[in-house]
Regions:
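N-terminal cap/lid segment of alpha/beta-hydrolase-fold proteins
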Residues: 5-61
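Mobile cap/lid helix-loop segments that gate and shape the active-site cleft of serine hydrolases
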Residues: 25-30, 181-211, 217
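Short, surface-exposed "cap/lid" segments of acyl-processing enzymes
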Residues: 50, 57-93
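Catalytic nucleophile-loop/oxyanion-hole region of alpha/beta-hydrolase
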Residues: 82-90, 102-140
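Primarily recognizes the serine-hydrolase "nucleophile elbow" in alpha/beta-hydrolase
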Residues: 123-192, 204
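Acidic catalytic loop of the alpha/beta-hydrolase fold
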Residues: 184-185, 226-230
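Short beta-strand/loop motif that positions the catalytic acidic residue
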Residues: 215, 221-223
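C-terminal catalytic histidine-bearing segment of alpha/beta-hydrolase fold enzymes
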Residues: 232, 236, 243-295
């Protein structure tokens, strides 16, 4: 993966195209789809409120469920791009490890602004709680992961934004994974796309860091070596706040050799950087009975 370091780390369509062009041949060689995928299951009335369930050949016991929320700058992206590994690779990765994979898509800005993303994550998790047993999954062992804008939506969900019942919304959730997210939404930290999604929402409402510090669900944060500087600053802010509140550092992975796009795109072909520590986190927090929040 050394070639990723030669790419301009700025988050642009060119970075996405170049990253996927480099990594897709590796996925095509090893395969990037689970044995069975049930597509476009609806968890709401909007056309974008859809999810795919990725399963294997089945096991004797209900399996943990790992959910992935894609990025796209709040205004783009999808759970599945036909003919590419996006993002069936995540479902395949989960299934190879004996879990159920779920990839979801959600409503986009500017038509749907904050906290629509968090509300969609909550609705998708509610659907999973109510339906995943039919696919061999354990509704009490759900881990929710998001990348970039997806991480922001997952962070909002974990912080209780957009719901009248934050604790109930997290029922069955055993862990949250925040891959290169933004947690401090002070005006100085907002770019054009953040303004499209958040509008004039005050920082004290939009920022998730205070809620994450109080969250009872185990959390894993990541930042990529070649993430732009603002993502490193966000990760440093999480570490400082966590140390001040809890007297220790949070679970955090520095994803060596990867950029903002390749962190998730590497799953299944470069396990050392993210796959192994991510799997270890999931295993640790789904290994026991009743591990989900308020199980």
């Amino acid at each position: 993966m050394a070639m990723l370091g030669a790419l301009d780390p700025a988050i642009t369509p060119e970075l996405a195209q170049s990253t996927w062009a480099l990594l897709t041949p590796f996925h095509e060689k090893v395969g990037y789809t689970a044995p069975k995928i049930d597509r476009d299951l609806t968890y709401g009335d909007d056309p974008r409120q859809r999810l795919d369930v990725h399963t294997g050949d089945g096991g004797h016991e209900p399996a943990p469920v790992v959910v992935f929320v894609h990025g796209g700058g709040f205004v783009a992206g999808d759970k599945h791009v036909p003919g590419t590994p996006r993002y069936d690779l995540f479902g395949a990765w989960a299934v190879r490890r004996g879990w159920i994979g779920v990839t979801m898509t959600y409503r986009l800005a500017p038509e749907h602004r904050w906290p629509a993303g968090a509300q969609d994550v909550a609705s998708a998790v509610a659907w999973i709680r109510n339906n995943i047993e039919g696919y061999g999954g354990d509704p009490g062992k759900i881990v929710v992961a998001g990348n970039s804008a997806g991480a922001v939506h997952v962070a909002d969900y974990m912080a209780g934004h957009g719901t009248a019942d934050p604790a109930g919304s997290l029922a069955g959730v055993a862990g949250g994974v925040l891959l290169s997210g933004i947690y401090d939404l002070a005006p100085a930290n907002r770019g054009q796309l953040e303004h499209v999604y958040y509008g004039d929402t005050p920082a004290e409402q939009a920022s998730t860091l205070p809620g994450l510090l109080d969250c009872q669900v185990p959390l894993l944060f990541t930042v990529a070596e070649f993430d732009p500087p603002n993502f490193h600053a966000q990760a440093a802010g999480v570490v400082a706040a966590w140390q001040a509140r809890h007297g220790r550092t949070p679970d955090l992975v520095w994803v060596e050799g990867h950029n903002h796009m390749s962190t998730i795109a590497s799953l299944g072909i470069d396990e050392t950087a993210l796959g192994v520590p991510l799997a270890r986190f999931i295993e640790r927090h789904t290994a026991k009975e009743g591990t989900g929040a308020h199980a």
